[in-house]
């Protein structure tokens, strides 16, 4: 599985020389959302690679009607305009992208769960401070919306043109849904980054060098005080840091 190999290599690179990774473990096994990242991310990588291969073929194809063959002086009416190859893969891509958000939200949930030495909700004062609780709510809402958006558009069809166009791909609907899934997923991942940085502020041990640099850069350049700033602003800061630099 090429995607799994890629995902595992990324994790090894990120955690290289981490002070936390080699620490003694009390738990026999981690939850799937941590332990199975290479398998889940890898499957999405492979799915997206397939989708891109189909899109590349489509970009280099004749997708019009009629088809004109200049050398043969022939014009043939056909169906190359039909967008089924795009519709199916756009739906598939939405499912693949949504899985990044699905597993990310589970990790965010565990980060605020008050386990493994971290305070509940990563709150500074338990009982009077809701910490990152609302951030996890937002991630859960994004993931839930993605599930609705991943209902395939390509299984739908409606008749038009007086019955002449009696099977259509709905590829445009699949494309607009994919764009929304991508945006939701980017926000869910930004919430995980924000939550992870809040957790790192609690820890004394350092993670891998490159990740530690990014963590330090983010917390030093942004006010992460959730008690004085709206959570929306913190999430927006994280989104901009992750995706718009």
Can you say where each PLM-predicted feature lies in the sequence?
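C-terminal auxiliary extensions adjacent to catalytic cores
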Residues: 1-245
């Amino acid at each position: 599985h090429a995607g799994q190999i890629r995902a595992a290599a990324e994790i090894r690179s990120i955690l290289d020389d981490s002070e936390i990774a080699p620490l003694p473990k009390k738990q026999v096994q981690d939850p799937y959302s941590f332990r199975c990242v290479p398998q889940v991310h890898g499957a999405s990588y492979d799915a997206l690679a397939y989708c891109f291969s189909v899109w590349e073929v489509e970009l280099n194809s004749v997708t019009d009607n009629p088809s004109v063959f200049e050398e043969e002086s022939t014009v043939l009416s056909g169906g190359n305009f039909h967008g089924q190859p795009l519709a199916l893969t756009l739906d598939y891509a939405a499912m693949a992208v949504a899985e990044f958000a699905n597993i990310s939200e589970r990790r965010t949930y565990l980060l605020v769960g008050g386990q493994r030495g971290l305070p509940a909700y990563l709150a500074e004062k338990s009982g009077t401070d809701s910490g990152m609780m609302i951030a996890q709510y937002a991630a859960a809402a994004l993931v839930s919306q993605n599930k609705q958006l991943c209902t395939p558009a390509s299984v739908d069809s409606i008749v038009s043109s007086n019955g002449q166009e009696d099977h259509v791909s709905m590829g445009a609907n699949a494309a607009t849904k994919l764009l929304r899934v991508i945006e939701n997923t980017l926000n869910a991942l930004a919430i995980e980054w924000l939550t992870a940085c809040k957790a790192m502020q609690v820890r004394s041990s350092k993670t891998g060098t490159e990740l530690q640099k990014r963590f330090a850069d983010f917390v030093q350049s942004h006010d992460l005080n959730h008690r004085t700033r709206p959570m929306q602003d913190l999430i927006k800061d994280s989104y901009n840091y992750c995706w718009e630099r």
